[in-house]
Regions:
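Extracytoplasmic
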Residues: 113-115, 135-137, 160-162
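Generic beta-strand hydrophobic packing signal
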Residues: 118, 123, 138-141, 165
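Extended serine/threonine-enriched, polar tracts that run as long, contiguous segments within proteins
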Residues: 132, 137-157
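Short secondary-structure subsegments characteristic of cysteine-rich extracellular domains
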Residues: 158, 162-172
Length: 214
């Protein structure tokens, strides 16, 4: 390697070229039983223990547990009617002898269609033997709404980095998952190929430099 630099990019899922990372969302899966959104592939593999290299930042220093991730995936709230029901006999609810009716409990959960973008970090380097500029992906992160800012019309959604997956450790999982090929639907890609071959459009928002990644 003659030279190299680490760069961070954001992949906007509203761009058509990036649709294979987003679709099919829930509701479209039956028409494409062999394909799932990238978000579902990642979250399912984490829950099943197939992906274990999951971190809280793109520097891959502090791991996130499944419990940490699940705390950001959903929230449970009680409706006003449910609170009134609880206030009628609050001691019984505190002791657990009574429970709020299920119809008055609201659960909000992050779904594949909530993913707004992906952030990726990779390493560009010049291979002097082959005389080529090459790219090696290091990590990927779904950007989703903070679940605690969802479901309230008066609140402005805030977006968070859900988790960072160390890409080299997830390649087996991504190689087994199919993505749509815009040019030839009869021949699907794998997510591993799509990401590693940079078949997406990204905008650089950070780069490695002497000032400390700005």
């Amino acid at each position: 390697i003659l030279m190299g630099k680490r760069m961070w990019e954001v992949i906007d899922l509203d761009e058509r070229v990036n649709f294979p990372l987003y679709f099919p969302v829930d509701g479209d899966v039956m028409s494409s039983p062999d394909r799932r959104p990238l978000y579902n592939v990642l979250v399912s593999a984490i829950k099943e223990g197939k992906i274990t290299e999951v971190y809280d930042s793109s520097y891959f220093t502090t791991k996130k547990t499944l419990k940490d991730i699940e705390a950001s995936l959903f929230k449970i709230d009680t409706s006003d009617v449910g609170r009134e029901q609880m206030n009628e006999d609050i001691d019984a609810y505190r002791k657990g002898t009574k429970k709020i009716s299920e119809e008055y409990i609201r659960k909000t959960e992050i779904q594949a269609y909530d993913v707004d973008a992906y952030k990726v970090v990779g390493y560009w380097y010049f291979d002097k033997r082959q005389g080529e500029l090459k790219y090696r992906m290091l990590g990927i992160c779904p950007v989703v709404p903070d679940v605690y800012t969802m479901g309230d019309d008066s609140a402005q959604k805030e977006y968070i980095e859900l988790f960072w997956v160390y890409f080299p450790s997830s390649r087996d999982v991504l190689h087994a998952a199919k993505a749509f090929n815009n040019r030839n639907s009869a021949m699907s890609f794998t997510f591993d190929h799509l990401l590693n071959a940079r078949r997406f459009s990204g905008v650089v928002y950070l780069e490695e430099n002497v000032y400390g990644d700005r």
